[in-house]
Amino acid sequence: MKAIIVLLMVVTSNADRICTGITSSNSPHVVKTATQGEVNVTGVIPLTTTPTKSHFANLKGTKTRGKLCPNCLNCTDLDVALARPMCVGTTPSAKASILHEVRPVTSGCFPIMHDRTKIRQLPNLLRGYENIRLSTQNVINAERAPGGPYRLGTSGSCPNVTSRDGFFATMAWAVPRDNKTATNPLTVEVPYICTKGEDQITVWGFHSDSKTQMKNLYGDSNPQKFTSSANGVTTHYVSQIGGFPNQTEDGGLPQSGRIVVDYMVQKPGKTGTIVYQRGVLLPQKVWCASGRSKVIKGSLPLIGEADCLHEKYGGLNKSKPYYTGEHAKAIGNCPIWVKTPLKLANGTKYRPPAKLLKER
């Protein structure tokens, strides 16, 4: 049997031959790399967002405190901190707190000389604790304190629940009953009465007025000296006599005098002392505070929930791991601030289409 051999001859024509390579569409994405500088890539994932200002919110999964006492209507946080009548109520616990009051912080009842002490800081001090409660008992018997007996002064601008004249529950205005004479400095010890190992915040102060009023109330029109000491911190004051313009608080009667209010922090089991002369505001109910609450500057009301609270932008939900814009304090599950936008390259390095090569 004969084999038939077919010879095939491949002839190359003069037609062009096309060589292909890696191709991709033109890419608008540029990323900066550590080794090659700016590089075009076929795809990127944005890692940053630029927030816009929004309402502050409750922090997701965390109790957030706005006002110290949400149910105390028409009360500033300083009213609550000093336990002004009609401003005493439940102070809920919180892991995060909004510092929402701006200067000047005022309180009713009686004109306060805010700038003489650190009293403006008291609401923020309380806000920094997770749990705060006002004691049910008084820390000392003010009527029988050294230099007494005293009657407890009240203010017509400070009505209580029965619409009678009242005063702050944290202090007793000690006015001598029948011994209206000058006195040398007297000392009262302030015991620790909190029951759960909390910090005890004890509020106290003194009253100053015109010479005539000081003489009528206390039997002494000279400047009076006061000192508080607790937890290794000692503070001294000398009262100012006269020079106060009449001032009205919350539609009450015009007041010719002023009160200076301060506080001291007593650690568990530690006794504080107050050295005083006439016009003292002796401590009564105290704040018992424990735990820590993160504090951030913000505004009320708190609307909805957010992953993060940011001082400049309010409530943020974390849609990207980083953000650009204004850098400020933030708490919660927050994106990280970066100066310029970040991108993650999720494609390949861009290569231009291969050129057509001709062979003759």
From Swiss-Prot:
Protein's cellular compartments: Virion membrane; Host apical cell membrane
Molecular function in Gene Ontology: host cell surface receptor binding
Keywords associated with the record: Disulfide bond, Fusion of virus membrane with host endosomal membrane, Fusion of virus membrane with host membrane, Glycoprotein, Hemagglutinin, Host cell membrane, Host membrane, Host-virus interaction, Lipoprotein, Membrane, Palmitate, Signal, Transmembrane, Viral attachment to host cell, Viral envelope protein, Viral penetration into host cytoplasm, Virion, Virus entry into host cell
Major location category of this protein: virion
Taxonomy, superkingdom: Viruses
InterPro entries: Capsid_hemagglutn (IPR008980), Hemagglutn_HA1_a/b_dom_sf (IPR013828), Hemagglutn_influenz_A/B (IPR001364)
Residues carrying sugar: 40, 74, 160, 179, 246, 317, 346
Post-translational modification: In natural infection, inactive HA is matured into HA1 and HA2 outside the cell by one or more trypsin-like, arginine-specific endoprotease secreted by the bronchial epithelial cells. One identified protease that may be involved in this process is secreted in lungs by club cells. Palmitoylated.
Membrane topology: Single-pass type I membrane protein
Signal sequence residues: 1-15
Entry's Gene Ontology cellular component terms: host cell plasma membrane; membrane; viral envelope; virion membrane
Any one of the GO BP annotations: fusion of virus membrane with host plasma membrane
SUPFAM superfamilies linked to this entry: Viral protein domain
Pfam families recorded: Hemagglutinin
Keyword Lipoprotein: yes
Homology family: Belongs to the influenza viruses hemagglutinin family.
Subunit structure as annotated in this protein's UniProt entry: Homotrimer of disulfide-linked HA1-HA2.
Miscellaneous section: Major glycoprotein, comprises over 80% of the envelope proteins present in virus particle. The extent of infection into host organism is determined by HA. Influenza viruses bud from the apical surface of polarized epithelial cells (e.g. bronchial epithelial cells) into lumen of lungs and are therefore usually pneumotropic. The reason is that HA is cleaved by tryptase clara which is restricted to lungs. However, HAs of H5 and H7 pantropic avian viruses subtypes can be cleaved by furin and subtilisin-type enzymes, allowing the virus to grow in other organs than lungs.
Protein name: Hemagglutinin
Organism: Influenza B virus (strain B/Hong Kong/22/1989)
